[in-house]
């Protein structure tokens, strides 16, 4: 049965065989015809049932559910990207199985220029019947011979040819160039191929041929080739539909929905393999006696039932079976049949298309029937056209039901209310049948009204698409190499991180001794962490960014906080120092009035998150402004004195400033109230810094050899002496040069949220210039500084985000991109944030090892209080920091505690501890 189409019409050889019984009367004839054609009528409800059943089978197969076996296979093709129009180069295409008993070789040139197409050169070779049914090696040797014969006629270099292999049979793919044949269809039954990798079989045959050096880059089926050959247009072409000898569809599915891939990101083209759909509940009611006969007489009874109602290999045979039945019943041809009419394969798809085409007229129908050895009358011609229309209309409607299921799956996958998509169509049924596509589109609109579908005829029968798959694979491989080269400096190994740890240990030692060092190692005069006995009401001020907070902190058996946020206008932050501190005092007075504290003199802790050299607990000399502050006449001054002077200017305000604290110390103290082992503070937010409890004997410039003191490392400046030069990239240099403090805070500029987004932006600009991103087109929005905030980095790397959500975030920023672009942007973000976390971890490892050695311990158990938006919000940062510390400081058990309001609560606790210690001293 699968050999239908090989014989064609045999004119002049037939003798008529006529029914000897009396012919039916006109009314009986009409009833017989209606009864026969009625079998091919499919109701809307039946189409909807097929749509729903197929959709259910698709979802079952995507989930990897094996029992009961799904009715469709949903095979991933490992084609993860659709073309974007810039692909170029020369490619060889070998098509096997797309057009029945022939193979085709093409030479395809892609220009990469929109609207400029070069017609492919091609040659078709008929496959002998003995090859189709012989040994597998014989088939692939035949294919390799055809390749060589075609290429011999082309003016081409014999070396380095890239080939795309279109193999249109059900296959299990495990890679773009690895595909195992599941089963033969379409009349092929070559031995020794099922269960084998067809790409390897082709490579072996090419090697045996020995004439050309050909790299088989990709294997796809004709359906994928059809989709990929669709010209990029206004709407994405993400569905391929082929109705040729057989029928199938493919579409771009979210990779996370394809269980067998175990991938979270990106998309993959899935071959539905709907020809094998055979749900008895859905298909049973629409199967006719003719379908059963056709199936029974085929090479594969019971298989490919859906395909046998739609594919071009079978439409002519269905028409033949109906015509033979009506002739035997005496309704057609005066009750006469012919040997041709009773022979399989005598009516081809081309005959059906011609007989139904209104432009050919009755004369062509008459001629075709005469070639079958029949003598049709005028009424016979009209009835034959009705039969052709009934068979083909049903095929188009069934195909539409299946396509509607695919569109519903795609819509659900994208979580879109309405779906706008282009469907690339290919195959001789779509191309040659006069009404197939119009019936198809009308039925799809009926079954999937929420989908706006454009049917786009394929170019070159899918051959160009196979070349496009090959070209896209080559482009992606080249882009992947460029991306890896760009990101390689951000991927730090153990030795590099250990070197950072060692460099920091040296800088710490120098700073503690008072020698020149990029780490200032500033004494904070905080000599103890909380012990839980602290009590009282305290005020806290928190100045470290564009917002300023005033807090009332009540310490009893727990800590209660009341606070208010006040903004600091840019004119104040960059105006005079007096203006800044007067504004701060105004905010404090406003807060006291609102809280009913006017006239009270509560102990006050001042969180001042800028580099200071402390001369006492309540004396801090500002070394330099950071974070965009530039208030004049402050650097080199005691900021507590500046605050007290502003209090004096305000008059009638009494404030007892007990301690000046930076946010890092406040974080350590805040967590220390909950965990006595917390002796390290870490901030990773807009900026970054760390502090820890150092042995007083190691701190030069502070009298005393016993006890401990918290040291403010100011590690953001680590590397300002050039010690991090080996890790600095061209992108770090660009960010540094564009900053307000070039050459300073080099460590901070590789770690903190204020700079990571800028590093990402500079990398994206570089990749765009290489043509890797945005099709090489300069995006104006990408020229804008600081468009990537910490929140953006945290959101885009979230494990819970699908790729479409990553794209949405980027599109909201004004960056139009493809799924491939989105994946690459994601990788860039991951590389930059991973390096930041690892560098931070190397710093923490240096600190904990210093504490362990200070105390002469084999093992140290210590806690780190952490604050900062990057650390808290980023999905991977905290775990990467912890993993790096474990790797570099294996003898330290380090617990990370997230601080709750370290800047406010911590400053109050520093004040509370100072009051407790002062009270003990008085006692």
UniProtKB/Swiss-Prot annotation:
Record region (Hexokinase small subdomain 1): 84-220
Residues the entry annotates as binding D-glucose 6-phosphate 2: 542-546, 663, 686, 867-869, 903
Region (Disordered): 1-30
This enzyme's EC code(s): 2.7.1.1
Class in the EC hierarchy, top level: transferase
GO CC terms, sorted: cytosol; extracellular region; ficolin-1-rich granule lumen; mitochondrion; secretory granule lumen
Keyword set includes Methyltransferase: no
Pathway note: Carbohydrate metabolism; hexose metabolism; Carbohydrate degradation; glycolysis; D-glyceraldehyde 3-phosphate and glycerone phosphate from D-glucose: step 1/4
Pfam families: Hexokinase_1, Hexokinase_2
Residues that, per the record, bind ATP 1: 95-102, 438-439
GO molecular function per UniProt: ATP binding; D-glucose binding; fructokinase activity; glucokinase activity; hexokinase activity; mannokinase activity
InterPro entries: ATPase_NBD, Hexokinase, Hexokinase_BS, Hexokinase_C, Hexokinase_N
Domain Hexokinase: 27-471, 477-912
Region of interest (Hexokinase small subdomain 2), ranges: 531-661
Binding site for D-glucose 2: 609-610, 626-627, 662-663, 688-689, 714, 748
Keywords: Allosteric enzyme, ATP-binding, Glycolysis, Kinase, Nucleotide-binding, Repeat, Transferase
Description of activity control: Hexokinase is an allosteric enzyme inhibited by its product D-glucose 6-phosphate.
Family per similarity comment: Belongs to the hexokinase family.
PANTHER family: HEXOKINASE, HEXOKINASE-3
Domain notes: The N- and C-terminal halves of this hexokinase contain a hexokinase domain. The catalytic activity is associated with the C-terminus while regulatory function is associated with the N-terminus.
Function: Catalyzes the phosphorylation of hexose, such as D-glucose and D-fructose, to hexose 6-phosphate (D-glucose 6-phosphate and D-fructose 6-phosphate, respectively). Mediates the initial step of glycolysis by catalyzing phosphorylation of D-glucose to D-glucose 6-phosphate.
Protein name as catalogued: Hexokinase-3
Provenance organism: Homo sapiens (Human)
Organism placement in taxonomy: Eukaryota, Metazoa, Chordata, Craniata, Vertebrata
């Amino acid at each position: 049965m699968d050999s239908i189409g090989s014989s064609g019409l045999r004119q002049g050889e037939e003798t008529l065989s006529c029914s000897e019984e009396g012919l039916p009367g006109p009314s009986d004839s009409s009833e017989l015809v209606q009864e026969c054609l009625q079998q091919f009528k499919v109701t809307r409800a039946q189409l909807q049932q097929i749509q729903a059943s197929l959709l259910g089978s698709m979802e079952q197969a995507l989930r990897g559910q094996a029992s009961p076996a799904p009715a469709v296979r949903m095979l991933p093709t490992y084609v993860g990207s659709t073309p974007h129009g810039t692909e170029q180069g020369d490619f060889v295409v070998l098509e096997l199985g797309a057009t029945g008993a022939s193979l085709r070789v093409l030479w395809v040139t892609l220009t990469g220029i929109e609207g400029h197409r070069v017609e492919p050169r091609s040659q078709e070779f008929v496959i002998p019947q003995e090859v189709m049914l012989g040994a597998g090696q014989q088939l692939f040797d035949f294919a390799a011979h055809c390749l060589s014969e075609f290429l011999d006629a082309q003016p081409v270099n014999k070396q380095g040819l890239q080939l795309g292999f279109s193999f249109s049979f059900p296959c299990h793919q495990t890679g773009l160039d690895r595909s195992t044949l599941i089963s033969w269809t379409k009349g092929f039954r070559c031995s020794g191929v099922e269960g084998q990798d067809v790409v390897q079989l082709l490579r072996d045959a090419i090697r045996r041929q020995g004439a050309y050096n050909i790299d088989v880059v990709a294997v796809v089926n004709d359906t994928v080739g059809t989709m990929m050959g669709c010209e990029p247009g206004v709407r994405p072409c993400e569905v391929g539909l082929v109705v040729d000898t057989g029928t199938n569809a493919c579409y771009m599915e979210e990779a996370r929905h394809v269980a067998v891939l175990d991938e979270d990101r990106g998309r993959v083209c899935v071959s539905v393999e709907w020809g094998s759909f055979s749900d008895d509940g859905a298909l049973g009611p629409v199967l006719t006696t003719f379908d059963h006969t056709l199936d029974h007489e085929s090479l594969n009874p019971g298989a490919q039932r859906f395909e046998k109602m739609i594919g071009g290999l079978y439409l002519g045979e269905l028409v033949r079976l109906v015509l033979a039945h009506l002739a035997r019943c005496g309704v057609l041809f005066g009750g006469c049949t012919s040997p041709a009419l009773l022979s399989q394969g005598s009516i081809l798809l081309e005959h059906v298309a011609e007989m139904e085409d209104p432009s050919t007229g009755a004369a062509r129908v008459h001629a075709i029937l005469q070639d079958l050895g029949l003598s049709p009358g005028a009424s016979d011609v009209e009835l034959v056209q009705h039969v052709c229309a009934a068979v083909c209309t049903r095929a188009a409607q069934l195909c539409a039901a299946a396509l509607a299921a695919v569109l519903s799956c795609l819509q659900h996958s994208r979580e879109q209310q309405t779906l706008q998509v282009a469907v690339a169509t290919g195959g001789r049924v779509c191309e040659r049948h006069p009404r197939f596509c119009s019936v198809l589109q009308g039925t799809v609109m009926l079954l999937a009204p929420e989908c706006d579908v454009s049917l786009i005829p394929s170019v070159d029968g899918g051959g160009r698409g196979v070349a496009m798959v090959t070209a896209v694979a080559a482009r992606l491989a080249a882009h992947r190499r460029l991306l890896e080269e760009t990101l390689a400096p951000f991927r730090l190994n153990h030795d590099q991180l250990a070197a950072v740890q060692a460099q920091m240990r040296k800088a710490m030692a120098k700073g503690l001794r008072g020698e020149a060092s990029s780490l200032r190692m500033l004494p904070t005069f905080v000599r103890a962490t909380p012990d839980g006995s602290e009590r009282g009401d305290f005020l806290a001020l928190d100045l470290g960014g564009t917002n300023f907070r005033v807090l009332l902190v009540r310490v009893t058996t727990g800590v209660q906080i009341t606070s208010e946020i006040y903004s600091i206008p840019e004119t104040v932050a960059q105006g005079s120092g007096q203006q800044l501190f007067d504004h701060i005092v105004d905010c404090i007075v406003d807060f006291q009035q609102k809280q009913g504290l006017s006239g009270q003199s509560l102990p006050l802790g001042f969180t001042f998150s800028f580099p200071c050299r402390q001369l006492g607990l309540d004396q801090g000399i500002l070394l330099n402004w950071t974070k965009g502050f530039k208030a004049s006449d402050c650097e080199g001054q005691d900021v507590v004195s500046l605050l007290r002077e502003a209090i004096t200017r305000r008059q009638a305000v009494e404030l007892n400033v007990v301690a000046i604290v930076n946010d890092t110390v406040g974080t350590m103290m805040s967590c220390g109230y909950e965990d006595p082992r917390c002796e390290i503070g870490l901030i990773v937010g807009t900026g970054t810094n760390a502090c820890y409890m150092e042995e007083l004997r190691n701190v030069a410039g502070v009298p005393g050899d016993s006890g401990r003191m918290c040291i403010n490392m100011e590690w953001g400046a680590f590397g300002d002496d050039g010690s991090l030069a080996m890790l600095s990239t061209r992108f770090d240099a660009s960010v540094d040069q564009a900053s307000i403090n070039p050459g300073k805070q080099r460590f901070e500029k590789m770690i903190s949220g204020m700079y990571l987004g800028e590093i990402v932006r500079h990398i994206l600009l570089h990749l765009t210039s290489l043509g890797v991103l945005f099709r090489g087109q300069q995006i104006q929005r990408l020229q804008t500084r600081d468009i990537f905030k910490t929140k953006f980095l945290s959101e885009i790397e979230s494990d819970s985000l699908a790729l479409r959500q990553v794209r949405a975030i980027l599109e909201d920023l004004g960056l139009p991109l493809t799924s491939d672009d989105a994946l690459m942007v994601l990788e860039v973000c991951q590389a930059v944030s991973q390096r930041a976390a690892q560098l931070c971890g190397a710093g923490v490892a240096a600190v904990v090892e210093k504490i362990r050695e200070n105390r002469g311990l084999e093992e140290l158990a210590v806690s780190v209080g952490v604050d900062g938006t990057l650390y808290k919000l980023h999905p991977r940062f905290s775990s990467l920091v912890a993993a790096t510390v474990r790797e570099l400081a294996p003898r330290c058990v380090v617990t990370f505690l997230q601080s709750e309001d370290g800047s406010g609560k911590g400053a109050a606790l520093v004040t509370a501890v100072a009051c407790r210690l002062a009270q003990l001293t008085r006692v």
